[in-house]
Curated annotation (Swiss-Prot):
Protein's UniProt name: Terpene synthase 3
Provenance organism: Dictyostelium purpureum (Slime mold)
EC annotation from Swiss-Prot or TrEMBL: 4.2.3.-
Domain comment, as recorded: Contains several highly conserved motifs that are important for catalytic activity including the aspartate-rich 'DDxx(x)D/E' motif and the 'NDxxSxxxD/E' motif, both of which are involved in complexing metal ions to coordinate the binding of the isoprenyl diphosphate substrate in the active site.
UniProt xrefs under InterPro entries: Isoprenoid_synthase_dom_sf
Short motif DDxx(x)D/E motif, span: 96-101
Keywords, comma-separated and alphabetical: Lyase, Metal-binding
Function: Terpene synthase that converts its substrate farnesyl diphosphate (FPP) into the sesquiterpene CAS 137235-51-9 as a major product. Is also able to convert FPP into 9-epi-(E)-caryophyllene, alpha-neoclovene, beta-neoclovene, and 3 yet unidentified sesquiterpenes.
Motif, NDxxSxxxD/E motif: chain positions: 223-231
GO terms of molecular function: lyase activity; metal ion binding
SUPFAM superfamilies found in the cross-reference section: Terpenoid synthases (SSF48576)
Family statement drawn from the similarity comment of this UniProt entry: Belongs to the terpene synthase family.
Length: 317
């Protein structure tokens, strides 16, 4: 008998519905950026940002304390730069949550926003104000890469919405879309926006590309494990690998453990690949710095994602 293929998720189709949260063991220590966050100043920026319809919406968003995640995945950014990075991250959260997910902004708007010479609406003006702050406090080439990665993420939202992920999709097919949608190329770009970029030959090497692919895989799976409960309650869309694999095993719990094992396996692979890359490019002076930063971004994301007190991922806050 041919196996039924599901394009939406309904936990009633899964035999094992009960599950406990599973935590990923990360081999690298998470470090929070030491720069203290002036909460009242940041809240006022949110209110003045032209990104919300009213101050109450800004206050409600502020309660998510997204700046905590930003501080952990941007641990080394200097004091004058981190404020712009946090604003950039919040800009992305807000545009995604309040505009993209509600279908209020589309691909044409994204293309226009990234054209610096084009007339901008109030949202675009806020974006370019942040970029100017980045340019004043960061590395020019790194800011250009950040712009590229941010645009790729923004456009990927619409590509991801069109993909047909289902209960029989392979992990490779899922990653093709999800690794862009989760936006961690953007996250890594902000973490190193103040630093001299790696040479082109390193960035284009197969080993470095495998490291970045693994980096994106870990973030996708960690995000899926953390957001599974919220996503299944908010939408029946098959947008999470925990959902996909649960249909393969008929168990949410087994799917959670499977994702945990996959992430921890990728951690080991990244360690091996980093050592291999250092052997391939022994004379690149900033290679160690960049490889360490990749690990710090992963560990920071994992740490905050598994912090049950982090408001954005806490369903009860």
């Amino acid at each position: 008998m041919q196996k039924e293929i599901y394009y939406t998720f309904d936990i009633n189709n899964i035999k094992d519905k009960e599950f406990t949260k599973v935590f990923v063991d990360c081999p690298w220590e998470a470090i929070r950026n030491p720069t203290p966050i002036d909460e009242s100043e940041h809240l006022q920026w949110l209110k003045d940002s032209n990104l919300f319809d009213c101050d109450q919406d800004a206050e409600n968003f502020f309660k998510d304390k997204t700046y905590i995640m930003s501080s952990y995945i941007n641990p080394l950014n200097p004091k004058d730069n981190i404020i712009w990075v946090i604003r950039m991250h919040d800009f992305i959260y807000i545009v995604d949550d309040f505009y993209f997910e509600k279908g209020l902004l589309g691909e044409e708007w994204v293309i226009n926003m990234f054209d610096r010479d084009a007339p901008q609406d109030k949202i675009g003006k806020t974006f370019w104000n942040i970029i100017e702050g980045m340019e004043k406090t960061g590395n020019k080439k790194a800011v250009e890469q950040l712009l590229h990665d941010t645009k790729i993420w923004a456009l990927s939202v619409f590509t991801y919405n069109k993909c047909n992920i289902n209960s029989e999709s392979s992990f490779e097919y899922y990653c093709k879309y999800r690794c862009l949608d989760v936006g961690m190329d953007f996250g890594l770009s902000t973490a190193k926006v103040f630093a001299e970029p790696l040479p082109k030959e390193v960035l284009e090497s197969s080993t470095y590309k495998r490291i970045i692919f693994g980096y994106n895989q870990t973030h996708s799976l960690i995000n899926d494990m953390v957001s599974f409960e919220r996503e299944r309650k908010e939408s029946n869309r098959m947008a999470n690998y925990v959902m996909v694999h649960a249909y393969k095993t008929n168990s949410v719990q087994e799917s959670m453990y499977h994702c945990k094992q996959m992430v921890e396996g990728v951690f080991n692979e990244i360690n091996v690949l980093c050592e291999q890359l250092k052997r391939e490019f022994p004379d690149v002076s900033n290679l160690d710095f960049h490889l360490n930063l990749i690990k710090l971004v992963i560990s920071g994301d994992n740490y905050v994602s598994n912090d049950t007190t982090y408001p954005r991922y806490n369903l009860n806050h």
